[in-house]
């Protein structure tokens, strides 16, 4: 068992503490406790009930009590708590005097079992005693003829405390004649002596008053003083003399009390009172005066009480012989006490390493200690040992010193600390042993990198996430400790879509939490591959990497986008054609839409939201096909408005609507003839729009008529050069003014009702589609039969005033569409489809004239919708077959059959050259009007 530290400071608040020993049968061991002195009555010493293996209430039931040995009862039992407590204040100095070890022994009797248990309580010293001189005033006499250097013996102070709390030094008040010299005796005691520094003159100063102060080594330092009165005497020639001047004697510690140890003898050659000697102890300690007795006349020393080797191995005394003339002589007396084996060995740690690095080499010294046994001979011979299962060994050094060394490599991650039990045993009979515990911590070395629990991670984040949102957390474990286990996280540098990954995701270096630095868009970014690095803070740092796959989950954040039919830029609705002869299920058009989302967020369904004629049309739920639900009747209006809704399957669903205008007619002339009779539901906004259109058409018509008049004047001046143009102008002059429509009116008509017609040779049904009108002033022409005639003549006046020639422009490939780019075909067609829309007033005039002529022919009933030479039948190359490709321009879908001429007004193509082809005859529509 290990005793607690024995150092106590004076004046501190001392808390009782207990050293719990091992409870065993009488004769095989004792219960040991330790406590500081001067505790209050009832202070806790130890849990005697626990050490006896009893409950507190069993103390009274079993008759447990303290058996005294005739001494004053110092301790008592508390029956309620089962504790051993003090019966009163215990003064160590009163109990054990100057003994270094103060132990109180008593027995505990358990009456019902008739068992006796030995108990030892060690009383630990505190600095509670001041150094004290025996007398408050000391009178010293000195001859006036004393030479410089004469020493006068002074009484030494006694300090009842032991160890560091005992006496340490002396101080003398300042004076001219004396100084203080402190002599250390062989027993370690400090003896003050007064040394004469200057000769004395009794006639000048008879008495010298000095103050001697004794100081101890406690904290705080305690002191005691005595007043020294030095009286100067007349000369005394001879001082007493001891022969020999030092005495020694050895006695066993168990000698009887009263045994005479030795006799001292001193001589003085003086006579009379100056030769009469008296013996006394100089600076006698209280322990000396209590242990030994000195006969003042004979100089005989005997024992007053028994000796204890463990309390004091030797006693050092100084005996003074003084004559009547105040001269003295002193002799040293050493009493050595012989040992009896009654002390267990002790371990004294000289040097201890509390922490050792785990990478230390085998043979590293951990501790240096010495062993000591208060006994002597075989009783003091000691053997040391430690447990064999530890990676340590003992190696003996000089004297009783030992080294504790490592025997193999240490691993902190396996064992972080050790508690090494050191056992020392003497060779006495019976042998005594002591155990001491040496704690040792293994300091960490950065030999383990951070470790991720998984080889890779994956996580997901929903798109449109807020910036700064936490998306994932990674944690790496480092089995090291301290800074070597402090892990920081970072992302490997990389780029994605031209931007660094650090602009997409950041990571908290301390927690490993990843944050989104931007709002992700599933349509732009679907996944990110990241590498997370975990680094410790060791030197050098170790690190490891783990991959993290970040997936962006789609949200329904995109409304369906309608690709076909496309809306015109002027705000009007697209127009589709349905013949009145169409049967139920006839495909009118197909609404094509896409959704940028994915999964069910992109699943689209179509429904008819509103119709001007309910029950006439139906929309395919999944195909978007607009079909007739019943046969068309004569009473059905020419213009039918359908509102088609396209909705996805997201949560919540998003939708888009599209208005389709269906023109019900078998022939294009029917459409032209019935334009004025189309009735639409009255809408306040439509009324305003109609008013604006009427005003615009009237204004444009006026401008157009003025232009025609100016043009006719110019043409009359060139009558001989433009017979064909003059004939065409004569036909236009015969048309009633009401048949003319302004340029903007024609353009609006074409944009609203531009269509494609698919005719088959074996069917009278025609499929007319009104695709999105396009906004450039170009019209594609195509050769659809063997004969062709120019549709438009362009003229240019050169410097030599040559005649204007009709030319056929080469194909314009600037906006040509290949066959693969077109939504679908329903008839034969040529691959070289070129043409341009008219973009000046003259071309517009000519186009208007031909449209009116075609309308007249259609009204005449002599030409079919397909048209031949000299008619303006509009043939379409596209039927109601569609693809998902968004076609932005449908101008090439309208052409004028029967002519291979290209409408053009490009400045660079009016060079007056003869056309390369197209020299067929052209019928004048004016003749048909006459018929």
From Swiss-Prot:
UniProt region (Disordered), positions on chain: 800-840, 901-931
Coiled coil: none
Annotated keywords: Calcium, Cell adhesion, Cell membrane, Glycoprotein, Membrane, Repeat, Signal, Transmembrane, Transmembrane helix
Extracellular face of the membrane: 30-692
N-terminal signal peptide: 1-29
Location in or out of the cell: Cell membrane
Biased composition (Basic residues): 921-931
Transmembrane stretches, start-end: 693-713
GO-annotated biological processes: cell adhesion; homophilic cell adhesion via plasma membrane adhesion molecules; nervous system development
Glycosylation sites: 419, 545
Protein known as: Protocadherin gamma-A5
Name of encoding gene: PCDHGA5
